[in-house]
Amino acid sequence: MIFDKSLLGFIGICCLPPILLLIYLPNVSLQWIIVQSGFFSFGAGLLTYKLIPSVADLTSQANLTGMDLNKKGDPKFSGKKIPESLGICVAVVYLVCVILFQTFQWFSFPETIQLSEYNAALTSICFMILLGFGDDVLNLRWRYKLILPMFASLPLLVAYAGGTTVVVPDINFPVPLREWLGVVFDLGIFYRIYLLMLAIFCTNSINILAGINGLEVGQSVVIATSIIIHNLIELTIASSVPSSSSFSSSALSSVSPHLFSLILMIPFLFTTISLLFYNWYPSRVFVGDTYTYFSGMCFAVVAILCHFSKTLLLFFIPQILNFLYSVPQLFGIIPCPRHRVPKFNPETGKMEAIPTNLTIINLLLMITGPLTERQLCVYLLIFQGLCSCVGFGIRYHHLHHNPTLIFI
């Protein structure tokens, strides 16, 4: 296989910062656990890469195939059927990897394992994999896609052991919020409702921002990388505390959530990168709703159980903007076609915007003019990465003034 240079560059840029942060992590014990998780994840990535062609043959035999709408009229690709629902391969390998490492962790580092969180995470992820594959096969209606994730999220709310308070912004316009509510305000049951809505948003937002070869998987790689970087930064700060040099109870309380998040996100990143090799332009497989729901729930799981749900939203800035821009169509205010992708011009070989399809994909084309599908995907992923940088700036801009804000 000949790898695209832009793809290799993208993967290299995503992988380099976490590797550097891991090298400089002060706590050797944590470092060793993460490295071991990396070995398991690397094996899962290789297995995914090897299995995808075989699973693609199986989905083709089951008539789970589709046409690439962005290549109509292109003599190289026109009429070619592409295997769909390859997210099922990634999801199954991911689950096997996490379960195997959970077993390994139980025997090697029993003091670091979080069984209730593991079980809740795997239950919710499995539910969404089932829903996604069911959608690929049965073509479920949107109302089911909004309702069923609520039930998938219930194990997360049961296992959630974090607080329900928020820091009130120091804003005096239009009203002095802190004078009315105080510095910290307890939302109670409304915070859990917010977590429920977060899970529904995550599972659907990646599915909404889709339709370009490599986009669904590429944005998941960027978000997963951002989460891993965030976790490593938090572990580095927590490890600078003298008591965190070993696995004391006080040290574990600060590092366990982020260690748990890394154990879930590292195999996700490796298996997703393997899928990206096949889904990059020109795509040889389609990921299906199985992958988009699986990836969205993975992000929701770590954000909720590891207590950084507000930080996760900073990494979802493009998805939030796309949702807000799409609201008139999503809620039926104006007609919403089944596929809101741009149109392909076979004469120029470029994608052109359809202004009535309200997505940031079409909005970008309206700003830049026609682009090739590869260029369009690269620009959108660059935007995703820049938004993550903005998110890190917002998240950590107070760190040099007050290091305790890092744990909010």
UniProtKB/Swiss-Prot annotation:
<feature type="transmembrane region" description="Helical">
    <location>
        <begin position="147"/>
        <end position="167"/>
    </location>
</feature>
<feature type="binding site">
    <location>
        <begin position="200"/>
        <end position="208"/>
    </location>
    <ligand>
        <name>dolichyl phosphate</name>
    </ligand>
</feature>
<keyword id="KW-0808">Transferase</keyword>
<feature type="binding site">
    <location>
        <position position="207"/>
    </location>
    <ligand>
        <name>Mg(2+)</name>
    </ligand>
</feature>
<keyword id="KW-0479">Metal-binding</keyword>
<dbReference type="GO" id="GO:0006488">
    <property type="term" value="P:dolichol-linked oligosaccharide biosynthetic process"/>
</dbReference>
<feature type="binding site">
    <location>
        <position position="145"/>
    </location>
    <ligand>
        <name>dolichyl phosphate</name>
    </ligand>
</feature>
<protein>
    <recommendedName>
        <fullName>UDP-N-acetylglucosamine--dolichyl-phosphate N-acetylglucosaminephosphotransferase</fullName>
        <ecNumber>2.7.8.15</ecNumber>
    </recommendedName>
</protein>
<comment type="pathway">
    <text>Protein modification; protein glycosylation.</text>
</comment>
<dbReference type="GO" id="GO:0005789">
    <property type="term" value="C:endoplasmic reticulum membrane"/>
</dbReference>
<feature type="transmembrane region" description="Helical">
    <location>
        <begin position="120"/>
        <end position="140"/>
    </location>
</feature>
<keyword id="KW-0812">Transmembrane</keyword>
<feature type="transmembrane region" description="Helical">
    <location>
        <begin position="297"/>
        <end position="317"/>
    </location>
</feature>
<feature type="binding site">
    <location>
        <position position="68"/>
    </location>
    <ligand>
        <name>UDP-N-acetyl-alpha-D-glucosamine</name>
    </ligand>
</feature>
<comment type="function">
    <text>UDP-N-acetylglucosamine--dolichyl-phosphate N-acetylglucosaminephosphotransferase that operates in the biosynthetic pathway of dolichol-linked oligosaccharides, the glycan precursors employed in protein asparagine (N)-glycosylation. The assembly of dolichol-linked oligosaccharides begins on the cytosolic side of the endoplasmic reticulum membrane and finishes in its lumen. The sequential addition of sugars to dolichol pyrophosphate produces dolichol-linked oligosaccharides containing fourteen sugars, including two GlcNAcs, nine mannoses and three glucoses.</text>
</comment>
<keyword id="KW-1133">Transmembrane helix</keyword>
<feature type="transmembrane region" description="Helical">
    <location>
        <begin position="32"/>
        <end position="52"/>
    </location>
</feature>
<comment type="subunit">
    <text>Homodimer.</text>
</comment>
<feature type="binding site">
    <location>
        <position position="213"/>
    </location>
    <ligand>
        <name>UDP-N-acetyl-alpha-D-glucosamine</name>
    </ligand>
</feature>
<feature type="binding site">
    <location>
        <begin position="338"/>
        <end position="340"/>
    </location>
    <ligand>
        <name>UDP-N-acetyl-alpha-D-glucosamine</name>
    </ligand>
</feature>
<feature type="transmembrane region" description="Helical">
    <location>
        <begin position="181"/>
        <end position="201"/>
    </location>
</feature>
<feature type="transmembrane region" description="Helical">
    <location>
        <begin position="258"/>
        <end position="278"/>
    </location>
</feature>
<dbReference type="GO" id="GO:0003975">
    <property type="term" value="F:UDP-N-acetylglucosamine-dolichyl-phosphate N-acetylglucosaminephosphotransferase activity"/>
</dbReference>
<feature type="transmembrane region" description="Helical">
    <location>
        <begin position="376"/>
        <end position="396"/>
    </location>
</feature>
<feature type="transmembrane region" description="Helical">
    <location>
        <begin position="351"/>
        <end position="371"/>
    </location>
</feature>
<dbReference type="Pfam" id="PF00953">
    <property type="entry name" value="Glycos_transf_4"/>
</dbReference>
<keyword id="KW-0472">Membrane</keyword>
<keyword id="KW-0256">Endoplasmic reticulum</keyword>
<feature type="transmembrane region" description="Helical">
    <location>
        <begin position="87"/>
        <end position="107"/>
    </location>
</feature>
<dbReference type="InterPro" id="IPR033895">
    <property type="entry name" value="GPT"/>
</dbReference>
<feature type="transmembrane region" description="Helical">
    <location>
        <begin position="6"/>
        <end position="26"/>
    </location>
</feature>
<feature type="binding site">
    <location>
        <position position="289"/>
    </location>
    <ligand>
        <name>Mg(2+)</name>
    </ligand>
</feature>
<feature type="transmembrane region" description="Helical">
    <location>
        <begin position="221"/>
        <end position="241"/>
    </location>
</feature>
<dbReference type="InterPro" id="IPR000715">
    <property type="entry name" value="Glycosyl_transferase_4"/>
</dbReference>
<dbReference type="GO" id="GO:0016757">
    <property type="term" value="F:glycosyltransferase activity"/>
</dbReference>
<keyword id="KW-0328">Glycosyltransferase</keyword>
<dbReference type="GO" id="GO:0046872">
    <property type="term" value="F:metal ion binding"/>
</dbReference>
<keyword id="KW-0460">Magnesium</keyword>
<dbReference type="GO" id="GO:0016020">
    <property type="term" value="C:membrane"/>
</dbReference>
<feature type="binding site">
    <location>
        <position position="84"/>
    </location>
    <ligand>
        <name>UDP-N-acetyl-alpha-D-glucosamine</name>
    </ligand>
</feature>
<comment type="similarity">
    <text>Belongs to the glycosyltransferase 4 family.</text>
</comment>
